[in-house]
């Protein structure tokens, strides 16, 4: 079992190829439904306007299956020659940097955080992830929050949409106008990217603002807070022809603006397509009176933004490296713990089953009822020790010695002399994690690292204390 990050993005391939493999929310759900990964494998698929990537904890066979299914979604085979692939620490580093905006077209943009979070939540709903990926993605979220609050990486244009507005402002100014002042603007699409664009335009003195969407109600909902009007979807080509600037960002998988359908513009019209896949027929750029920019043009324009923010990159990367180290330490911690925890549970369960076999017939209870009762008792007795064990500092000498002692005490006799050293962790560059650890129900999803116990731990401790008090009371009455 290894960590993998694979995919296509603006760093390794062209916009045309990336959009071929773009997956809608429905296509991602279908991909999860069609996956048949090995036991304990976990995967999250991310598809945005600039990247389609998969983050996997699994085997090479699992990886081949994920790539094949993404390829099927694009109607072709997986492009091994242009796609990127990272594994283990490099894969974890890639996810942390993507989530923090370090790998975005607009360096430091914050929209990617919401997109990664949505991808994570979609995978959770599909049952695609368990303890390891839960921990990994919440580590990525912590990295993004710290980079945003502790560095200057996100200053200025904060998303693809806002960068598109800034690029349009510069283009219109260079064309002899007043930038965005007194312009007539049409927004085609009323999704998240469109709303972000309107927010970037909120303080501008526009001549007019019109929103066009397939759903008239949705168009009114988006336009109303900004004092905008709406036009029917069927009139979108005419609306664009009357505008100084058209921003296009729908969720369609095919172009929604077609060159032959566009009337000659009243004046020069700038069309900015920020959708993936592209929503505007490339032939629009050849029509007299129209200028078309897409994500490739935006990437070139944002090179200046990246240069201005370059000073913040080392600090942001340092934060990612710090949290990467924390995550790898946690993985090794879980890997070292797992044999000891399994040995403890196995020993207790063997004793439980032996005693049930000996005494179940005396209770008058059904065997299944006795099994459930004794299993519940065993889990409650082990809850606090196991939670305490998982909270021990993995870098302490006591941790290593304690784990070896526990394994020696509880390992089956045929394993006790196997000479296995739990103090030996895998090499940090190749964290081959073996079997994934079972999810600990007492671990918070976003641990703060402040040493405080979760509500579940406190509940387990209260139950243990109550049990001890009851036992003491019985002893007092009996004495």
UniProtKB/Swiss-Prot annotation:
Its EC number is 1.2.1.70. Homodimer. Catalyzes the NADPH-dependent reduction of glutamyl-tRNA(Glu) to glutamate 1-semialdehyde (GSA). It comes from Salinibacter ruber (strain DSM 13855 / M31). This is Glutamyl-tRNA reductase. Possesses an unusual extended V-shaped dimeric structure with each monomer consisting of three distinct domains arranged along a curved 'spinal' alpha-helix. The N-terminal catalytic domain specifically recognizes the glutamate moiety of the substrate. The second domain is the NADPH-binding domain, and the third C-terminal domain is responsible for dimerization. Pathway: Porphyrin-containing compound metabolism; protoporphyrin-IX biosynthesis; 5-aminolevulinate from L-glutamyl-tRNA(Glu): step 1/2. HAMAP family: Glu_tRNA_reductase. One of its GO terms (molecular function) is NADP binding. During catalysis, the active site Cys acts as a nucleophile attacking the alpha-carbonyl group of tRNA-bound glutamate with the formation of a thioester intermediate between enzyme and glutamate, and the concomitant release of tRNA(Glu). The thioester intermediate is finally reduced by direct hydride transfer from NADPH, to form the product GSA.
